[in-house]
Structures are given as structure tokens and as C-alpha cells.
Amino acid sequence: MKNKVFLIGMPGCGKSTIGELISKELLLKFIDMDIYIEEKTSKTISELFEQGEDYFRDIESEACKEIIKYDNVVIATGGGVVKKGINVETLKNNGLVIFIDRPVEKIISDIDVSRRPLLKNGKERIIGLYKERYDIYNKACHKIVVNDGTIDEVIEEIKKIIINN
């Protein structure tokens, strides 16, 4: 079993919820990268984005370098972590990267945009991000899990992947 598991995917695909549940079931530590960044900087993700997306992405890259030091951990990354090639390389070289692929229609129906700075422009923005990032997520991962069933089904599938790798 890999001792570091990185969950990647669109905002609203279930990374944080699924990651926390899996970590409890497998007795692993759980880190939500956005919360890690907020605690480290004493600012919300929205506040950091107010200083520019590039500024935020630099902080996110630093967080990637820091979180790989943890062992026996499931990490829910930020949705845009894959935008920087160095982050993809860091994650892929240091653990198992799983892309949680949730159909964009389900993300739109489930998501609370108030906590997601890049999604405040609504449905069109989410669809645009999905199209922009889909291939990047596919290339950045070791495994893909489609999240269009029940949460229990997704958790079981991911647990099997983790245990068998």
C-alpha cells in the first residue's frame, strides 16, 4: 500500500469528503490542502486569490513540497494544483495520485460557489474549467475513479486501489 495518496480533481468532485472518510477507514492521517494553506497563511483561499491566482499558485506549490513529508496520509489537493507541472511531478513522484472524475453536471448541481473563488461566475465557469483541466487531470494521475454513484461505492473503489498499490 502506498503511504501517500493524493486525490485530484475538479472543485466539488468530492476530494475532501471522500479523502476524510477513506483516511478514517484505513486509519491514515488526512490533510485537506486548502485548509493546510489557510492555516499556514492565516488567510482564506478567497483572500489569497484576491492577491492574484499566480500568487496563490506559488503558495500552493510550496504547500505541495511541504505535505510530501507526511507519511501514511490521504491528501485532498486543491482543484487547480495540476496547473503547475512542478506540482504534478511532485505528487506523482511521491505517492499514488487518484483523479476523482465527477461528471460536470453533478458538480454544478452540488457545489457551493461561495467558498470557491474560481467558480463565483457560475455554471459556465465550472464547465470551462472542466474542459480546460480534464486532460491535465488524466495525465497527472496514476488511477481514475468516476464519482457518479454513491459515496460508499466510490470509497470502496478507492480503498481497493490504495490497498493494491
Curated annotation (Swiss-Prot):
For this UniProt entry, the molecular function terms from Gene Ontology, in alphabetical order, are: ATP binding; magnesium ion binding; shikimate kinase activity
Q: Name one Pfam family in it.
A: SKI
* Residues that coordinate or bind Mg(2+): S16
For this chain's record, the cofactor binding note is: Binds 1 Mg(2+) ion per subunit.
Q: How does it assemble?
A: Monomer.
What is the role of the protein in this entry? Catalyzes the specific phosphorylation of the 3-hydroxyl group of shikimic acid using ATP as a cosubstrate.
Q: What is this protein called?
A: Shikimate kinase
Chain's gene name: aroK
